[in-house]
Amino acid sequence: MSAVAPDGRKMLRLEVRNSQTPIERKPEWIKTRAKMGPEYKQLQQLVKGEGLHTVCQEAGCPNIFECWEDREATFLIGGDQCTRRCDFCQIDTGKPQALDRDEPRRVGESVVTMDLNYATITGVARDDLEDGGAWLYAETVRQIHTLTAEREAGATKVELLIPDFNAEPEQLAEVFSSRPEVLAHNVETVPRIFKRIRPGFRYERSLEVITRAREAGLITKSNLILGMGETREEVSEALQDLYDAGCELITITQYLRPSVRHHPVERWVKPHEFVELKDEADAIGYSGVMSGPLVRSSYRAGRLFQQAMEARGVAAAGSAQAAQAV
């Protein structure tokens, strides 16, 4: 077994240990069928013809057909090297390139070209930057809102999936000031195994980020990945923790191992458990829940946003105002 990662660097001890376990065979329910509707086909041709880049196609997301049919897509900002390492994430850890200050404009132009209804922006942790990359995240939201302001179908909604910025008040304030429609920060796993799976993050700090976003008036969202060593009871506790912290939207998914260097799959969660977890999250009080083996944090993101708006009474208030104006 080679002790060298694909990018040529020496593998970490954890990666060497992980690589002793072969890639697991997926159960029969971990599969999807391609349903290529007209909107998907149009976007596929557009992305290819314009040389655009989205996480959707580059990561081989199984939900691309559904999301693109809704004119939703996800973009990665900040480069392809993260300053932190999570044991489930396919983005590599290393020294990032210099900050590309034109990236927000280019992402905004891509959103315009694709005529998206909803864009999810995610990115790498940039602890090498003085502001942790806060300006980059915020400016990308601002560019999308500005460039799509005159869009016939309405300005593109933006979901911003952020690292924790070490919960630094100034950095979070910069990000929150851009007013994304949804502010997402993914906790991903439960407290007992959190440090092992996400050594660069802290569970309580992640909850704090969600709380601060909610206090800033933003719709909040998080994600839990199952199959990395958690127990069923711990998942229930994490769902309650997130809700108590102010989380309104939640996605729950099965861990799929990116390579032998990553954490082995410890269990395959059966479909009925995902249904049970959705019912449980609904009962706790979440405004919107997506739970399933192939759900990803940006899956049906626009629909979850609408559910959160309805739960807040925004849609009802808007209808009442329209009726009064007639």
UniProtKB/Swiss-Prot annotation:
[4Fe-4S] cluster 2 binds at residues 82, 86, 89. Keywords: 4Fe-4S, Cytoplasm, Iron, Iron-sulfur, Metal-binding, S-adenosyl-L-methionine, Transferase. Binds 2 [4Fe-4S] clusters per subunit. One cluster is coordinated with 3 cysteines and an exchangeable S-adenosyl-L-methionine. It catalyses: [[Fe-S] cluster scaffold protein carrying a second [4Fe-4S](2+) cluster] + N(6)-octanoyl-L-lysyl-[protein] + 2 oxidized [2Fe-2S]-[ferredoxin] + 2 S-adenosyl-L-methionine + 4 H(+) = [[Fe-S] cluster scaffold protein] + N(6)-[(R)-dihydrolipoyl]-L-lysyl-[protein] + 4 Fe(3+) + 2 hydrogen sulfide + 2 5'-deoxyadenosine + 2 L-methionine + 2 reduced [2Fe-2S]-[ferredoxin]. The keyword DNA-binding does not apply. Its cofactor is [4Fe-4S] cluster. It is found in: Cytoplasm. GO terms for cellular component: cytoplasm. Its EC number is 2.8.1.8. Residues 68-287 form the Radical SAM core domain. Pathway: Protein modification; protein lipoylation via endogenous pathway; protein N(6)-(lipoyl)lysine from octanoyl-[acyl-carrier-protein]: step 2/2. It comes from the Bacteria. GO terms for molecular function: 4 iron, 4 sulfur cluster binding; lipoate synthase activity; metal ion binding. [4Fe-4S] cluster 1 binds at residues 56, 61, 67, 298. HAMAP family: Lipoyl_synth (MF_00206). Belongs to the radical SAM superfamily. Lipoyl synthase family. This is Lipoyl synthase. It comes from Streptomyces griseus subsp. griseus (strain JCM 4626 / CBS 651.72 / NBRC 13350 / KCC S-0626 / ISP 5235).
